[in-house]
A protein has these predicted regions:
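Short alpha-helical segments and helix-capping/turn motifs at coil-helix boundaries
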Residues: 10-11, 16-20, 209-212, 280-283
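Catalytic-core region of carbohydrate-active enzymes that cleave or remodel glycosidic bonds
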Residues: 1-140, 144-148, 152, 157-159
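Proteolytic-maturation and junctional protease-sensitive modules
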Residues: 281-320
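A structural signal for short secondary-structure junctions
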Residues: 26, 217-220, 276-280, 287-290, ...
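Active-site-proximal substrate-binding groove within the catalytic cores of carbohydrate-active enzymes
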Residues: 97-250
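Short conserved micro-motifs at the rims of enzyme active sites and ligand-binding pockets
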Residues: 12, 44-45, 236-239, 307-308
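C-terminal beta-strand-rich structural cap/linker in extracellular carbohydrate-active enzymes
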Residues: 315-336
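Proteolytic processing hotspots in large secreted/extracellular or virion-associated proteins
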Residues: 226-230, 241, 246-290
């Protein structure tokens, strides 16, 4: 899978790598490529330089760590069931010549009866002419992809659109727990970890990931990495509605709330200036642990800076993070 991105100035682009990795792992893909790492000479600009920047986007870079741990380390199981549809050469030619398929919408399973939500639940594949049929697979008619909660057949990833305008992606695997989307005001009890996101600039939208960096699982670990981030932009960058040109927001450290807008946006190629501003989203985490643990804020190089207070409630160690700590990531470690 190549050339994937949620381009800036998309206000929700902190989700980019996580969304790709979760479903790439579920589909058991061989490789994924974000577009693009950085194609300009100003490699240390300290600001997002264009729509597709990865290397100067703090949250896209930080979330490459849980992305790697999930996808490359194989921390999430591929979907159990495989749904296939056969596409022969003549049918492919007809789809293209009729204009039904085109450069940015090449022939895919949607033309052959596979429901758009099926890949959120099962593995899917096209069987092209000359390819053998898998010994065990389901046809599109054999499966039902009904929502509003699209949970994978492994139970490790779910896309919840119970509120169509406030979707949430949840990953719950042995070494990764992610809550991505409009998650504020809810409590996510994920067996050994409870995540309780709070309100954000984007009306409760944010990214919270917890990854086992040292250890086998959330029952047996020595070190965790927590990322809690949201809106990412450049200082002074103005976001406008694409059609009307109406200003939605001007980025600054004084920004308190953003208009909830579900339409095309643009910065009119005015990318503001350094430094990039990143929202550290507030959340409370409850981690089940039999030993004492400590939590630290991290600087931009990953070094410990400030200790975060932890309280004890039954089997849980509890702490809260947020914008007051002026960081997007934290280390949680078992006390030696």
């Amino acid at each position: 899978m190549s050339e994937y991105d949620h381009p800036a100035p998309n206000m929700y682009d902190a989700e980019t790598a996580l969304t790709l990795a979760a479903y790439a792992a579920l589909q058991d893909w061989d490789g994924i490529f974000l577009f693009d790492y950085g194609s300009r000479d100003s490699w240390d600009s300290k600001q997002i330089r264009g729509c597709f920047d990865i290397d100067q986007h703090p949250v896209k870079m930080a979330t490459m760590i849980p992305t790697y741990m999930l996808f490359v380390n194989g921390d999430m199981n591929p979907a159990t069931e495989l749904v296939t549809a056969r596409l022969d050469t003549q049918e492919e030619k007809e789809l293209i010549s009729s204009g039904k398929a085109r450069a940015w919408n090449l022939p895919d399973g949607g033309y052959l009866g596979i429901h758009p939500a099926t890949p959120l639940i099962h593995r899917t594949a096209l069987i092209v002419e000359g390819s053998p049929e898998p010994s065990q697979s389901l046809s599109p008619q054999d499966v039902s992809a009904t929502g509003p909660v699209y949970e994978a057949d492994t139970n490790e990833v779910a896309w919840d659109v119970s509120d169509r305008n406030r979707g949430v992606l949840v990953v719950n695997s042995s070494r990764n727990i992610w809550v991505v989307g409009f998650s504020s005001g809810r409590s996510y009890d994920l067996t050994n970890v409870v995540v309780e996101p709070e309100d954000t600039l984007l009306h409760g939208w944010g990214v919270v990931t917890l990854t086992v960096m040292e250890g086998k699982s959330f029952q047996d670990w020595n070190k965790l990495l927590l990322i809690a981030a949201g809106y990412t932009t450049n200082d002074g960058m103005m976001i406008r509605q694409y059609e009307s040109g109406k200003a939605i927001a001007v980025a600054s450290t004084d920004l308190k709330e953003l208009e909830l807008y579900n339409g095309g946006i643009t910065c009119s190629n005015n990318w503001g200036e350094a430094p990039t501003l990143v929202e550290g989203v507030p959340a409370t985490l409850k981690i089940k642990a039999s030993e004492d643990i400590e939590a630290w804020t991290l600087d931009n190089t990953g070094k410990r800076v400030e200790q975060v207070p932890i309280s004890v409630e039954g089997d849980y160690r509890i702490f809260s993070v947020g914008p007051g700590y002026r960081t997007i990531w934290y280390e949680i470690a078992v006390k030696e």
